[in-house]
Amino acid sequence: MQRVRRLGRRLRATPTAVEVHHGRGPGSQGDVLFAGPLPPAPTGIATYDRAVLEGLDRIGFTDRVRMETLWPVGTQDAGRFPGYHLGVFQLGNNVEFHLEIYRAAYLTSALVVLHDLALDDFVRGLKAAGEPLGYMAAREAGRLCDELTDPDVIRNEPLREPWCAHVVRRARGVIVHSDFGRRYLAGFGVRTPVFVVPHPAIEGPEAFSTSAPRGRELRASAGDPPFLVVAPGDMNEAKQLDALVRSASVLGTGSHVAIVGRRIEGYEPEAAIEAAGAAGQVSVHADVSDADFLAWLAAADAVVDLRFPHRGEVSGSLSRAMQAGVPSVVSATGTYLDVPDDTVLRVAPGPTDVSELAHVLARLRDDAALRSQLGAAAARHAEHLRTREATARGYERAITETLALVRDPGRKAMAIWGKSLVDAGITEDMVAQGFGMEYARALRSFEPGPEVAASQRNFERSP
């Protein structure tokens, strides 16, 4: 409660209006502003953002487009946002890191990057602090929740209400990291352009080979077990760590589970370990360095990365495990269903069944050829995405197409005209019959001809 009160004081002290001075309109500051956490911020989105920016540099995008990076984002930055044609805003489910970024998405044309489809905790935090945007987001989510009928969505409580709907429908473009994200947004009628961009490779393959010696040391510290299972990432209840701990007891001696990652307030894996009597078979390694995190992955025979409830996120830990060539066990839900079938083993969605998980892990333990096959396929897939610069190219396309949209001189006029038609009682059926179409056709005269469009494309490609 003290944290909520502090946040409330912070919000109440924030000006609710932004003064934009003459001469600071779109483009006066630059083409694009990229706003999101960067290292050493203690969130996985920080390393993600660093990898994205490095990729855009490698492909020469930042030589062609004026793009600035902003972190941290504070209330004092509010007046800057309207000076850019487009903001690329990284949004996660944490008020501490994403409050001002979320606000910024309402101050300028926005390309929103959704790291969590379910912004439930974020929106509740806004409401608890009395932030008007929180109430607007909650109202929109409640209005649209009946549109979501996918059984996989209904199974996962945080996804049942589209908490992201308000900001997504306000945005000019949206980036998600799997096709599940695109399907989820389509499920409640989003018409904003959606771009599916894969999670970036955080490291190159050499990072895992150089981690191998440290990995052997860490494996030895766990008793040098014949079969080492690593559960990487934030330690929380949704990772189904309690079920993993109990499955370790079923596996018996010769297997060891290492839980490695950041501690999250409100969950302690030690309680589950004690309850299962698995102290000798499970170890906890909290808040390790990034180097040791990679070393644990390099040392692992298998990785377990489960989710229930699922929030529609793509797991950065799973991406790293695939890069390391480690076979992984995941939940058959949401974004995990978009991972190639030959790179992972899946357990049933919902609360993890201990006996099923133990059976799958025993299968991996006893079949070295299967482990090698899955790990090699995972590494090939990750390397294919990395060498293609799939993430950077995806961002390039999303930013370029969204910039073209916001620069279109007919777009705003069309939006105003469309609203006027609605106010006048014109329905979609009436539009199909031709009502209001003469003005819309006239606006097409603002579109560049083929020669101009080709010239613009060549200019954008030139260094």
Q: What does each of the following model-derived ranges do?
A:
Residues 2-24, 380, 384, 388-463:
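C-terminal amphipathic helix plus adjacent low-complexity
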Residues 34, 223-239, 245-248:
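Conserved donor-binding/catalytic core segment of Leloir-type glycosyltransferases
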Residues 144-145, 269-291:
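Nucleotide-activated donor-binding/catalytic signature segment of Leloir-type glycosyltransferases, i.e.
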Residues 154-194, 201-203:
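A short, active-site helix/loop in glycosyltransferases that binds the activated sugar's phosphate group
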Residues 172, 297-312, 326:
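Acidic donor-binding loop of glycosyltransferase active sites
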Residues 232, 256-270:
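Glycosyltransferase donor-sugar binding loop
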Residues 327-331:
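Short hydrophobic beta-strand element within catalytic cores of glycosyltransferases
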